[in-house]
Every structure is written in C-alpha cells, then in structure tokens.
C-alpha cells in the first residue's frame, strides 16, 4: 500500500517540531553547574547556621553547669558554716553543762560539809553530855558512899532503859511515895583498905577519872575464872547468893553471857557501883554469906527483864555452837558483874578500854572508830561465848592485837579491798595456762539476743549516724559504754538482729560478721558485728549430776568470744570433773563478762580456787581469767547471828564472816593480808 506525498511531509514536519521543542526544554551544562553550586551554597549556609546554633547551645550548657557547680560549692560552704556553728553551740552547751554540774557538785559538797559539821557538833554535844553525866554520877557516889540520891524525876537515859526493860516507874525503889529523893541500897560493911589489882586499874578519859569502872569493857560481864581468892569455891558462893536473893534470874549458861547495849552497861554498872562504894571491891574476896547485900527491887526487875529479852537470841546461838559447854548453877548479878578473868584477857580488854578513852572529837573518823570499836566488842563477846574456858586464855593471846589496830581501824577498808579484788585479773599473775582452739559454733536456727556488739567503730561517728545506718533493720537504741571504738546496738525484737546479719559480710572461716558504715572522715569503714546466741549461755556436761553451790567457782574477766561450752572445756582440761558451765548475762540476755563453773568433786573445786588466775591463749586472743569461790547467802561462821557478807578466800579461813568478825579474825599481823570477797548482787545469779 503506498502513501501519498502529503502524508509524509506532514509526518516530517511534526518530527522536526517535536525535536525543536525538546531542545528548548533541555538546559545547558552551565545551567546545570550553576544550579548545583546554588544548592551547595545553600547547604553550606544551613550547615554553618546549625553549627553556630550547636556551639551556642554548648556554651549555654557549660555556663549552666558552672553556675550549678558554684551553687553547690556555696551550699557546701553554707553547710560547713552551719555545722561549725552547731559544733560551737554544742561546745558552749557542754561547757555550760559542765559549769552547772560543777556548781551542783560544789553545792552538794557544801551541803555534805554542813551536814558533817552538824553531825560532828551533835556528836561532840552528846559526848560532852555523857561525860558530864558520868562525872556527876561518880562525884555523887564518891561524896555519899552510904546512899544514892536521885532527882524527883528520872534522867532521860534511866527512863529509856526502864522502858526497854519494861520496868514501871511506880515499882522503882527510887521513885515511890515514901522515899522520893533517895533510897538505901543495904547495910554498909566495914571496908579494909586494899590495893587494886592491875585488872581493876583506873581508866582515864582526858581529865575525868573513872576509878575501877569501865565504860564499854566486858570484864564486868565475864565469869570464866573463879571469883574467890581465899579458897572459897565459886559454886558455894553462888548458892549462898541465890539463897539470900530469891529474885535472881538464872543465867543461860557459863559461856553465854548476855550482851547489853552501852547504855544498859553504864546504868547497870552505876547501880552496882553504889554497892562498891559501901564496901564491895572487884579485887576483894567475897564477904561472908551473911554480909552479901541483896539487890534493890529496881535492880532485880531490871536484871530479870534484860535476861528475858535476850534469852531467846542466846538460845539460838548456843544451839548452833559446836563448842557449847554444860550449863552451870545460877549466878547472882554481883557475881556476873565482878567475876575476875585471866590476865591475858584482862590485858586485852584494858587495851580496848584505853583505846576507847583516847577517842577524840574529830568528827567522822571519831564516829567510825567508835562504831568499829563497838562492833569489835560485840564480836569479842560472841567469840568468848563460843570458846571453852580451858582454851580461852590461849586463844585470846594468840589473837591479841595492839590497841592501835582497832583505834586506827577504817570500817570501810574491807569494802574497798573487796571492790579492788574484783579487778585483780589486771595485776594478778596466772598460775596455769591453757592454749588451744575454741570449739566451733554450729547452730541450726539460732535465737539471738536483741543486743549486738559493734567493734572497730570510727572515732568520729555520731549517734545520729549510727541510727541512720542501722534503723533500716528496726527500731533500736544506742549504748555507749564510755570507751571509743565500740558500741552496743539494742533492738526491740530479735528479728532485727537476723536482718542485720543477713546484710553483713560473713567470713565463714572465722565465723565473723562485718558491716560497712560511713562517717564524716571515713566514707567506707568495716565494723565487726558480734551477736550472741542464747544457747551459748549454758552448757551441761553431766546431766545426771546435781549442781552444788559449794563446788561452784565464779570466773571473771571473760572474753566476749568465750561461750559456756568453751569455758567448761577449758576448766575441764585444767582441773577436771566439770558438771556445768554458765555465762552471766544482763536483762537483755547479753554476756556481762563473767560466768560460773560447777565441779562434781571437791578436789577439782579447790584446785580451781587455789589457781586464782588462769591465762587463756587462742589464735584470736589472749586473756587472763579470775577464779574465785561462788558466793551465796550465808550466816557468819563465827557469831552465827549476823549476815556473812564477806568471804575470806585464804585456805586458813575459807569461810563467811560479818564485818565485826572479819576484823577480829584478821587482827593478827599474819592474817591481815587475806583477801575479802563480796557478792556482786547485780551480776550474780543463783544456781
């Protein structure tokens, strides 16, 4: 099929038009480069803008950080200033408190001084009054030997003794309606001049003279030797005296002399001195039977009631005395008062009276000497009642001590010595040593004490810092024992202790617990946490054995790592036959540094007591323990009437004693070095 020429021409024209149009729309290379450069310039400008913006932002951030740092520094400086101010305030408060305490102490000292001065003045007045009364009575007796004159009313001392003896005033021969001013004590026998014996020598108190009369001596109340010096038997004299005086009350026994108070002694001796002024004398042999003068009704009633008031106590003492002697026939009061005594006893009693006569008016020292001397005399009376008459002279001579020992005696020296002995482990020498490893602590589901020990505490730690560190485990209190480096944490419940131990680092090789705390100077410091398992407080080695207190020793100065089992093992290795061991604890069931060990044999017990100090050596520590007899409640072994608050651990004594008997027992020079023990009631626990 053929095309026409017109059609071809049209097609060619269309093609050329299209090509022309395409060339017009396609840009040239220059235009393309220009556009690319424009785009690059735009991108560079954008980049420059963004860089400048980022730099400005960084600068702003840096300035902000600098400002923040400056603010923090300012805050720290402010805090430091506040802390310094607080420290200054605390120091000022402490200084003020110290000043207040010093002022209070000064006021207390002034009050005590005033009280002491008042007491001294009262004592001086009382002594002066007593001396004046005694002088007046003696002068009155010397002036009127045939009668004893009384005032219309009784003196205060006479009235007190009459009330004590239950003697009504209406029955007194000195104060009746028929004779209200004086009464006669009996016929006046003819008196021959006789030189007094050394046993009845005069006693002087500064200027007053007391003749053959002793203030607080017991010579007038002793009957250990025969009364007569002319061969007349004492029993015959007693029978005649009792026949002529049916109102005489029987004495409880030969050696059980009834102790009287000082006022009773003075009054009763003054009664009988009236008879002495009429012809009787302690150094004279007794008069014939028909010349023995009867007692007045007042004397009979007084002596009878005094005997009845003391008989019950004396029976109890005599019933427990292993040296009790058989009862003797009854004696009259004259024989009881004027019986003679061996020379050794007279000399000793005279020395005591001399010591009493030299008492000064120096306040507290005088009062202590006075009370100590009375206690010594009471103990001396008790010992004389317990000692047989055949060996009494030898016993007194062996135990005799110079009067200066009792005159200069400090009644509180024994208490100070006992307190010093409690800390004797620091200076004592160990007699034996134990070396080894402590038994391991293996407990399943242990129960702890709510009290925990912290060791190695930073020196600058405060209570608030400790509260902040440990309050997360439970409510607690901080106890500062007073030494740097350790404290006690006291939680309310045992569960808090468990939580604390779980947060601690546990050294399984040694069983130690460590906890990290921070202070102002130390950011991280490990302190040792030492809990106490309640099962470690007691350990029984022989369950079938009975625990006896007389085979138990007290062990002091224990280390905190020593358990009851460890203590028992140590004592068993050293002395053997351990039955039980226990650790003493406080009210929170935490150890207080002492324990008890009970033995099954007396031999092991005595070996432990004789050791006194034991040194313990372990890989962790070395410690010296103090071993003493375990003390309980006991009666004095000598008088059997007072509480035995002191124990002599020396093997020559080894018994409980009261204060008076202790001084009397240890009067010889060879026994003054014995060490006293007292019971510490705060820490001692009964078995």
Curated annotation (Swiss-Prot):
Belongs to the RRM CPEB family. SUPFAM superfamilies: RNA-binding domain, RBD. PROSITE patterns: RRM (PS50102). Induction: By neuronal stimulation with serotonin (at protein level). MicroRNA-22 (miR-22) binds to the 3'-UTR of CPEB mRNA and inhibits its translation while serotonin triggers down-regulation of miR22, thereby up-regulating CPEB expression. Sequence-specific RNA-binding protein that regulates mRNA cytoplasmic polyadenylation and translation initiation. In its amyloid-like oligomeric form, acts as a translational activator. Up-regulated at activated synapses where it is required for the late phase of memory-related long-term synaptic facilitation. Sustained CPEB-mediated protein synthesis for at least 72 hours after neuronal stimulation is required for the persistance of synaptic facilitation. Activates translation of atypical protein kinase C. This is Cytoplasmic polyadenylation element-binding protein. Pfam families: CEBP1_N (PF16368), CEBP_ZZ (PF16366), RRM_7 (PF16367). Exists in 2 different conformational states, a soluble alpha-helix-rich form and an insoluble beta-sheet-rich amyloid form. Stable self-sustaining active amyloid-like oligomers are formed upon neuronal stimulation and contribute to long-term facilitation in sensory neurons. More than 80% of the soluble form is found in high molecular weight oligomers, the majority of which have the size of a decamer or larger oligomer. The insoluble form binds RNA with significantly greater affinity than the soluble form. The N-terminal Gln-rich domain can confer two distinct functional states, a dominant active prion-like aggregated state and a soluble state. Gene3D superfamilies: 3.30.70.330, Cytoplasmic polyadenylation element-binding protein, ZZ domain. It comes from the Eukaryota. Isoform 1: Enriched in nervous tissue. Isoform 2: Predominates in ovotestis and is only weakly expressed in nervous tissue. Residues 147-159, 221-242 have a biased composition (Polar residues). CDD domains: Bbox1 (cd19757), RRM1_CPEB1 (cd12723), RRM2_CPEB1 (cd12725).
